[in-house]
């Protein structure tokens, strides 16, 4: 079993910011999305739609508690990814785990979703 995708639901204007964020920071590409009743986007990493974005209203979702802490991705190219975060003024913190030789970067998207990106075998210089 593996996680297929994450879905972020937000008002349309915020969703456009979130779409831009994932496309520019993560390099995801907007692709095919079935003709669902509501609007949204599927963002692809290669041939996999890993981030789904859907338009939601302000009222019911705002009242629902959210216990999701963060979503984690694994990547390569730590230095280039840090440069991308700097270029887009994304504040982040880093953590190195020597026992497994992995650097982690933690930050949030414009909707406030906590994100972690892991870089096995790479260390902040």
Put a short name on every predicted segment.
Residues 1-19, 69-71, 125:
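N-terminal beta-strand motif that seeds the catalytic metal site of vicinal oxygen chelate
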Residues 9-50:
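Core segments of cupin and vicinal oxygen chelate
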Residues 37, 67, 101:
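Exposed loop/turn and edge beta-strand positions of beta-sandwich/beta-sheet ligand-binding modules
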Residues 50, 56-58:
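Short, conserved turn/kink motifs that form compact alpha/beta structural patches or helix kinks used as
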Residues 64-90:
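Mid-chain, well-packed structural core segment of small domains
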Residues 87-125:
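Vicinal oxygen chelate
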């Amino acid at each position: 079993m593996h996680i297929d995708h994450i879905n972020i639901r937000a008002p349309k204007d915020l969703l456009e910011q979130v779409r831009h964020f994932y496309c520019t920071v993560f390099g995801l590409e907007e692709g095919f999305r079935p003709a669902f009743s509501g609007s949204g986007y599927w963002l692809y990493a290669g041939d996999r739609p890993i981030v789904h974005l859907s338009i939601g209203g302000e009222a019911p979702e705002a009242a629902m508690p959210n216990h999701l802490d963060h979503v984690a991705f694994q990547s390569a190219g730590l230095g280039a990814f840090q440069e991308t975060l700097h270029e887009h003024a994304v504040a982040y913190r880093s953590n190195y785990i020597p026992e497994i030789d992995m650097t982690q970067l933690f930050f949030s998207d414009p909707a406030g979703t906590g994100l972690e990106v892991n870089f096995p075998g790479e260390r902040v210089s």
